[in-house]
């Protein structure tokens, strides 16, 4: 479609809200935008009235425009966000965070709730707190909660089946609701106290605890008063360590940006009840447009993934869609909020803190990327690769004598793990211990569609596995693809010509008889070893999980009266065979479908059976 045809399509575009998709000659989406008035918005791209720096580059590539009409501007905003996440257009900002940050979860609808760490919040009616800036901070918070609010940490199955208190009760880290040592009302009060602390209402909680301590002392319940006193002291010490930055006691997210060219680092300062809880550095973003456009899309994508939306969001620049985004966030949050651009005072000071953190994060990230680029450049040079190995995919096989065979693929982008690119394969067509055939199957299943090919394929193994990979690429008519084999150390203490120890990892290249040793280039060797080891870890963990489940199922197959339904019920309740061995008859009979007679049979069988139930070590 030429320029005249494009302008003709725009002339008949509706003057209603909606989304427009700009595509190149191959039909690939270059840019997704939203508009209150589709006709006037898209016309600006070709009339010269849109002064954004990216517009000439974008317009020169547009061959088609597609329109999707919506009822309201807010619907257009939501649809735009969904399309960007689905298609990742080049000229849109695309926030993709492969980290799964920890949240703390508590379901207050349960009779005896517990606090637990989860990675992905769900819409299940529970309360979620987070995400925490690091796993260490999340675990530290959970440990603190458990030290001053002695709630259960056990799974639901253990809570229902236990007949005597566990060790946690003995060391005063749990009040044993499993055996009725605390009633539901008192237990829930302690959970609510923990929730108050997580919500940042520590001062309110302290006032309430002091009142309850005073009342307990007046009633001569000195044990309860002492218990409350210790909790008060622990909370006071924690609150003293938190820096008060605002006397308004508000919950705020403050977005600081640092930009060099197309690269943008974002730091979010997390403030709850006027105190800095921490900061969160987002992955380095690449965006060719204006900062204001980036901010709109970033707010949509960031809060679309979050369950923790504060009452104030501070941003460094004005955005066109602020009102619509605010309405969308209020709907998600269930109450009002503000999106502000601070011009003076404490808000501006906090924004500067966030921006300084963003700049520091950018420089650290840039140095890391520069180091990775140097390692990748050396890798390309030493191995004579055709392309710069920005995207690398590595494969490993795991099995025991051909049993429960699996393959794993890991992806590294710019020298770093890209978890969204990991894949696991349960080997389907190979019977017996044939690692070569297993590798062929895994490679075929990954590359037969010829989509999103990497710059480099790494297979774990020597000449044989490399030959398999090379053969597979030939069978699929994939040419020009770099592939190498990385063999683990085999022989110790044997020196070959040139003084190279043969115990070193060896790299095998197509059409080369001799292996290449990389000890002279430690950065390259370390990178390849890290990739190989991650593929091995991923494969072994998958195989181990399958083996544990298989051992569990096969052992229970020998018990009369235990079929598939009861096996699954036992697995769901106890998790693994070792826990079932530890269970009493009474605990076994708590599982649905298992009465006293069958529980006794299972208990007797497991304690007479001598087969190992230890998990595979790979």
Curated annotation (Swiss-Prot):
Main location: cytoplasm
Alphabetically ordered keywords of this record: Cytoplasm, DNA damage, DNA excision, DNA repair, Excision nuclease, SOS response
Pfam families linked: GIY-YIG, HHH_2, UVR, UvrC_RNaseH, UvrC_RNaseH_dom
Keyword DNA damage applies: yes
SMART domains: GIYc, HhH1
An annotated Gene Ontology molecular function: excinuclease ABC activity
InterPro entries attached to this UniProt entry: DisA/LigA_HHH, GIY-YIG_endonuc, GIY-YIG_endonuc_sf, GIY-YIG_UvrC_Cho, Hlx-hairpin-Hlx_DNA-bd_motif, RuvA_2-like, UVR_dom, UVR_dom_sf
GO BP, one annotated term: SOS response
Assembly with partners or alone: Interacts with UvrB in an incision complex.
NCBIfam families: PRK00558.1-5 (NF001824), uvrC (TIGR00194)
Protein name: UvrABC system protein C
Species assigned in the record: Syntrophus aciditrophicus (strain SB)
